């Protein structure tokens, strides 16, 4: 994450901290840009976060009492990156998925909630800053050199590992999330933490990050501990971070492209949302198969006409209502009236 921090420092945070916490109280005390003495204000020396590119700092990088290597500045910056950039990513890509991928006919489903899209967005807005608060200490530890992140192949285990790190990351995090997710379904935990995410029986892409914040943070822990246990290339880390967010949106978009026996895609995750106690995995079906919690999606889910048919919906509703009674007791969800759905 030091690469991301360097980029955001260069284009945003240097100017923000120079304005909020200036090294000198008055603007006229700043040295002229042409004399190159701005560095006299600070003992901090620029070192690129990666050998693949460098961004020569502007004068603003030296004009705050909180230099780039200040731990308090790093903590605040990383918190803001997680929260605000996470929010931007969520709105942009969940919206694109909602507009171009999500089948709006899903909103006619008997278990689609009243004002569901806005409720999903509201839940996400409330959750993201709290999730960011619990997450930023991991990133601070990373940028301060306590992780096993590496830059070039020569600094890592070798060329073979540059490729092996990707399946290793998927398998490790999938295993961790499986058990955390399954634990969140324990009766002593479910109603307090995981129930808010299961409010969405027929989720939209906006449900992707609509968690109780502790639930969302708990399921992200495997991602954040991985680089403290295994080596991980810095650029691969950033790419995987982006991929995780995309994947989370994709498995909530309701578009079932393929009935793959290995990949835990949108169809498998949709089964989890209406049948609750199956398909806890994030990326693959492996751990569900080994843990006895795998349920193959019905073939009808991959035929659009059948997927959206009254017969299929009725079958899902009957099963869902039975399971909700067992897991939650009374169903306190507020569903959209059928007449209203038909008029849309």
From Swiss-Prot:
It catalyses: a Delta(7)-sterol + 2 Fe(II)-[cytochrome b5] + O2 + 2 H(+) = a Delta(5),Delta(7)-sterol + 2 Fe(III)-[cytochrome b5] + 2 H2O. GO terms for cellular component: endoplasmic reticulum lumen; endoplasmic reticulum membrane; membrane. Its EC number is 1.14.19.20. Keywords: Endoplasmic reticulum, Iron, Lipid biosynthesis, Lipid metabolism, Membrane, Oxidoreductase, Steroid biosynthesis, Steroid metabolism, Sterol biosynthesis, Sterol metabolism, Transmembrane, Transmembrane helix. The keyword Endoplasmic reticulum applies. Pathway: Steroid metabolism; ergosterol biosynthesis; ergosterol from zymosterol: step 3/5. A motif (Histidine box-3) lies at residues 269-273. GO terms for molecular function: C-5 sterol desaturase activity; delta7-sterol 5(6)-desaturase activity; iron ion binding. May contribute to the regulation of ergosterol biosynthesis. Belongs to the sterol desaturase family. This is Probable Delta(7)-sterol 5(6)-desaturase.
